[in-house]
Regions:
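Hydrophobic membrane-insertion alpha-helices, especially the h-region
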Residues: 25-42
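Membrane-embedded segments
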Residues: 116, 126-128, 134-181
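N-terminal Lys/Arg-rich, disordered targeting/topogenic segments
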Residues: 2-19
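A substrate-binding/cap region within the structured catalytic cores of diverse enzymes
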Residues: 179-259
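Ser/Thr/Pro/Gly-rich low-complexity linker/stalk segments immediately outside membranes or between
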Residues: 44-58
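C-terminal functional extensions of proteins
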Residues: 265, 272-332
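N-terminal, Lys/Arg-enriched amphipathic/low-complexity engagement segments
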Residues: 57-114
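Short Gly/Thr/Asp-enriched flexible loops that form oxyanion-binding sites at enzyme active sites
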Residues: 147-154, 271-279
Length: 332
């Protein structure tokens, strides 16, 4: 480095104008780099996150068709629409019937009966790492029929293979109509070509997953209808044996990439409060607790490194994703 006539440090062979031009070019390059970083942080990431928007729209539209079809089934069977079903979705059942298993919040049931839940399920599956062509296992109780169908619509829109095991028992305001249980809803939707995948197996749900506590006469009538429909029914009261049978059904065709749990069936949640403590939404396998004899499928799959989409605690789930909870009117 030498010095110019004014005592300033300079670069050999470079006059003042040349230095100014070089500085300007460097500043322009820095500005371009900064602009690119800002663009990627805002538009680029946003675009990457919403690259599945087409599947979200398809899932919402498909879920709307499901709701419409179920309303038609209820009309055929002379099942009145619930007064609590403010939006007339057909997804809200009576408070208590012979197949009601536990208490449930009507606000949560109404919140899930919104077509955009199909779009939310697409997002959750993508966040869990699921992609087209993957295989997903799903455990459905009758407590959240709308959310069950949202998962089915999301998987169908994403071209994901879904293996559902559905249960009859439902908490209050769920699929509690004894004449139209959730497994029957799904079966009819497949028969009518609205959905493409039926239950891989059906259980009665409730206590011991065998319908203990249900009205015996209604339980027998439902079993007869399910058998006549050709659905595979299994009744295994022993907890660990039940879990083994479910995993065998889920993984019969090969490994799964994700497990989806909807509602509070003991086979998914586990014995006691263990499943609730895990939270809701996408569960990372790194959050897994040690598996015990009381662990349900949620914990067991997490323990094997398989992500789980846990659809429970709807109020907290909607808050986390900026969605309304039990609004009087749904946003456009």
């Amino acid at each position: 480095i030498d010095h110019d006539g004014n005592g300033n440090a300079g670069v050999p062979g470079m006059n003042g104008k040349q230095r100014e031009k070089k500085i300007v070019r460097l500043l322009m390059l820095c500005a371009l780099i900064l602009f690119g970083a800002v663009w990627w942080a805002s538009y680029g990431v946003q675009r990457a996150e919403t690259s599945y928007v087409m599947e979200q729209r398809q899932a919402a539209e498909l879920l709307t068709r499901c709701f419409s079809a179920v309303r038609g089934y209820k009309e055929e069977l002379h099942i009145p629409m619930s007064q609590e079903d403010y939006h007339q979705t057909g997804m809200i059942g009576p408070y208590y019937t012979g197949i009601t298993t536990t208490l449930g919040a009507i606000e949560a049931k109404r919140t899930t009966a919104w077509p955009d839940m199909g779009a939310l399920c697409v997002r959750l599956l993508y966040e869990a790492g699921v992609r087209p062509g993957d295989r997903v296992a799903a455990g459905f109780s009758g407590s959240f029929p709308a959310m069950n169908l949202a998962v089915m619509a999301a998987c169908q829109s994403m071209k994901v293979e879904v293996i559902p095991i559905s249960s009859v028992g439902a908490s209050t305001y769920g699929a509690t109509d004894p004449e139209l249980t959730f497994p029957e809803m799904l079966h009819r939707l497949v028969q009518d070509g609205v959905l493409t995948t039926d239950s891989a197996a059906v259980t009665l749900g409730g206590d011991n997953d065998t319908g203990d506590g249900m009205l015996p006469e209604q339980k027998m009538e439902i079993l007869e209808r399910l058998e006549q429909a050709g659905l595979v029914i299994f009744q295994e009261p022993k907890f660990l044996n039940n879990l083994e049978q479910r995993q065998e059904i889920y993984e019969r065709q090969g490994p799964i990439q994700c497990f989806v749990s909807v509602g509070g069936n003991v086979t998914s949640m586990g014995v006691g409060e263990r499943g609730i403590a895990l939270g809701q939404g996408v569960l990372d396998p790194r959050s897994a607790m040690p598996v015990t004899d009381q662990s349900g499928l949620v914990e067991r799959y997490l323990g094997r490194g398989i992500p789980v989409v846990h659809l429970l605690n709807i109020k907290q789930l909607t808050a986390e994703y900026g969605l309304p909870y039990d609004p009087v009117q749904w946003p456009d």
